[in-house]
Structure formats: structure tokens, C-alpha cells
């Protein structure tokens, strides 16, 4: 038999369930976030604006956390996993931007979708 869970309760349970993963990947995720911020720079003024909008819109960064955790579980000791995790997050973000254009979404994570601010073409190109 199924159980209906309120959205607020579901969010709290989800956050609690990934807390051990967040803690286990904290140091490497700090480096991933630094990498993401560093790579969002550009001489084209709109690119950092769109990037900042996306970064500030939240999200759990679950995919890069899983990348970091997988590297750790496999005994990886290098630093390449940070770049890989950043790449995974960039790819995910690109799919979200594209999805918002295709679906003509006005909002992403409760904020105006990038396409609503900068238009469809700019959102896809960034």
C-alpha cells in the first residue's frame, strides 16, 4: 500500500537521507564548487551572469557527489575526480537549460528560468 508524503516532509527526509553522502564528500565538493566558479568566468559578460543565476538557484549537486563517492569507493587517490565531478555538474546543468527551452518552462527551482531572462538562444549557447 502506498503512502502520500507532503512535499515539505519529503524534502526533509530526502535531505536527511543524503546527509552521510554530503559529509563524506564535503572536502572534495568544496574543490568542485571552486572549479565550477572558476570555469564560469568569461570575457563575454552574459556568460558569468547566466552561470551565477544557475549556481545561485540551488540544487543538491547529487551527481558530482556520487562521482566523488564512487572514486573514493574504488580507491582512487588522484585529483582527476574533481574535474570529472565538475564536468558531470556542467553537463547536468546544460540539460536543464535545454529542457527549459524545449518545455517552454518559466521557472527552474522556483526562480525564473534562464530562458525567461536571457532568451532561448543565449540559454542554450551558454
Language model features with spans:
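Acidic, low-complexity proline/glycine-rich segments
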Residues: 1-4, 118
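ATP/NTP phosphate-donor binding region
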Residues: 14
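Mg2+-dependent prenyl diphosphate-binding active-site environment of isoprenoid biosynthetic enzymes
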Residues: 20-126
Amino acid at each position: 500500500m502506498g503512502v502520500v508524503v507532503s512535499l515539505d516532509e519529503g524534502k526533509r527526509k530526502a535531505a536527511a537521507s543524503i546527509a552521510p553522502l554530503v559529509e563524506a564528500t564535503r572536502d572534495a565538493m568544496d574543490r568542485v564548487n571552486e572549479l565550477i566558479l572558476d570555469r564560469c568566468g568569461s570575457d563575454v559578460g552574459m556568460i558569468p551572469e547566466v552561470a551565477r543565476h544557475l549556481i545561485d538557484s540551488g540544487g543538491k549537486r547529487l551527481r558530482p557527489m556520487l562521482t566523488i563517492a564512487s572514486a573514493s569507493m574504488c580507491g582512487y587517490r588522484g585529483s582527476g575526480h574533481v574535474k570529472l565531478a565538475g564536468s558531470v555538474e556542467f553537463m547536468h546543468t546544460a540539460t536543464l537549460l535545454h529542457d527549459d527551452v524545449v518545455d517552454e518552462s518559466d521557472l527552474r527551482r522556483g526562480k525564473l528560468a534562464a530562458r525567461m531572462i536571457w532568451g532561448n538562444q543565449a540559454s542554450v549557447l551558454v
